[in-house]
C-alpha cells in the first residue's frame, strides 16, 4: 500500500513562493499509483489547486487531516468547489486529528493491519520522519530534492521538477546483505518502487547504496605515514586495475585523464594531511574506483584503518575532517563515516526503536558534487547487530562526536 503525504507546512529550505511549493509537490505526482492521498488542511486558496494536481494520480482515497472538526474542511473549501472528477473518482475521508500526528496514526493503523505502508512526502526530512515512525527500514533520499541530482536544478523553470523526479526515480541501488563479501548475494534494486519488497527481507545490518554507473577503473593507493607525519604515496599508475581483470587482482596500466589525476591527488593530499594531524602512524590503503566521467570515489578506507586499531573517535573525526576526500560510506562501521553534523540527516534515527535494535542510520554528504549515497539498514534480527556496531550507535549520542569538525 502506497500513501502520498505532501504537506506544505513541512517544507524546509525553500523560498516562500507558492508557485515553487506547488512545483516541488508536482514531483510527487509522477511514478507509481498510490492508494491514498493524504492532505493537511488549512491551505486556503492553494488547497483547490493542490487537489486538482492530485487528479493526475490514480488515487481512490483522499484523506484530509489536520482538522479539529470535519466541517472545518467545508468552511475553507465548499463541496461545490470540488472538481466533479474528484467527487466521482475519489473517496473523501476526514481525519479529525491535528497535523502530522493524524497521518502518523492513520498510516500506523494501516501497517498494524498488515499493510506494507510506504509514505512519500515533499521533502526529505518529512519523509524520514513519517517512514521512521512507521518502522520502514529502507530510507531513500534519492526521491527528493536533497539528492545530488537537485544541485543546480532551478525548480522554478517549467518542467524542471518533473524532470528531476523522473531522473531520481531512475537511480539504481545495490542491496548488500549483512556479512556479504566480494559482492556475494548482492541484489540490484533497479527502481525505488521495488524497495518495499526488499525491505521486508532485511536482517541485521544491511546496506542499500547507490550504484556507481560505468566503473571503468579501480585503484588501490597505498599510504605510509612516517613517525614525523610525512605521508608517502605509491605512484598511481603502478596500481591501476581495469576491466574484468580487476576482479582477479591483475593490474594493468590505465591512462587516467590529467583532470582525474589532479583531482585525485588533491583529495589524497587532504586525506593524508588529516591522517597526520590525528597522529596516525603506519600503513593504510584506500581503494578507489573511477567512473566513465572521470569521477573518483574512495571506498573501504575504514576497513584498512580499523585494522591498524585506530581509536574509534579519532576515525570519526578523521572522516569529518577529510570530507572532501571521502565519497563513500562503508557498510560495517557507519559511525566512522559520518560527515559533518549538517550532513548527517536525523542522526538520532540510529537510536530509534533500539529496544528491538531496529532503525536506520542515514549518512549523506551534501558537500560533494558527485557523492555516493549509502544507507545502513537495521532489520529486526537483534543478534545480527554486533556489540561493536551497537557501540557506534551509542557513540552517536555523545555530544563530542556530533560536533562539526
Predicted ranges, named:
Residues 1-15:
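Nucleotide-activated donor-dependent transferases that construct or modify glycoconjugates
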Residues 17-32:
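Histidine-anchored nucleotide/phosphate-binding helix
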Residues 26, 39-151, 159:
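Conserved N-proximal alpha/beta basic substrate-recognition cap immediately N-terminal to
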Residues 147-150, 172-175, 188-215, 401-404:
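Conserved ATP-binding module of the ATP-grasp superfamily
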Residues 211, 246-295, 332-357:
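A long amphipathic alpha-helix within ATP-dependent nucleotide-binding catalytic cores
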Residues 214-215, 220-273, 279, 302-329:
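ATP-dependent carboxylate/phosphate-activation module, predominantly the ATP-grasp catalytic core
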Residues 319-405:
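Peripheral (often C-terminal) accessory segments that flank ATP-dependent C-N-forming ligase machineries
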